[in-house]
Amino acid sequence: LVKAALLLVSDSAEQPLTITTGFPYSTYRIYKDMATEFLRKTHIIEFDASTYSNSGKRSVILDVQNVEVIPEIVGCTIALRKGEHQAEGNFFVLSCGFGTFESVLSMESGIVEQTMVSTHGLKYAVNMMMSELEKSHYLGFRNAHLMDEAFQKGYIILNRKNVDLREIRRNVLRSYYNEVISPNLRNVITD
């Protein structure tokens, strides 16, 4: 994915490049140095351009000089404060992704690291839905990402039948909130 992202900016970005990327707070310290080392270098990317033009195999050279690796939730906070909304004051930032749910208290002076929460994302609820469906349906080789798509749509085709997932989705989201989100937030939000 990183090479695909670099390829997408190759025609429009000035070199040397500066890259900012993020990891979930729970793993960001583990991977920060590795990611920096992997990204900060000259990248030679070969690709087949014939899928969208008449040219064949091409390559681009991209020089990455500066790399910043931050927790994803910090990136969310920066976007809220410096981006379009220009948020002010003290507030909690909640980020619910597929793999990770994160939250942090953001103050004018910065984030409060003791309020940082990093736990299971929506994949937890999707897996609960899969377990529920397996009780009455054969799911075959469907994985969590395919089920996530069905989770979002609210239906899935199983055994040539349209199965409505809205009630199951509502129940597993309620369970996900009660089992994962609420207990974790309760530890940092005491108002």
Model-predicted segments: where are they?
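A short mid-domain helix/strand-loop element embedded in enzyme catalytic domains
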Residues: 69-73, 97-102
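Short hydrophobic beta-strand that contains or immediately precedes a catalytic carboxylate
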Residues: 93-95
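Short helix/loop capping segments that flank catalytic or ligand/cofactor-binding pockets
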Residues: 78-79, 102-104
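Nucleotide/phosphate-binding catalytic cleft detector across ATP-hydrolyzing
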Residues: 1-91, 110-124, 158-191
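Glycine-rich phosphate-binding loop plus the immediately following alpha-helix
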Residues: 98, 104-143
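A mobile "lid/hinge" subdomain adjacent to the ATP/sugar-phosphate binding pocket shared
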Residues: 133-173
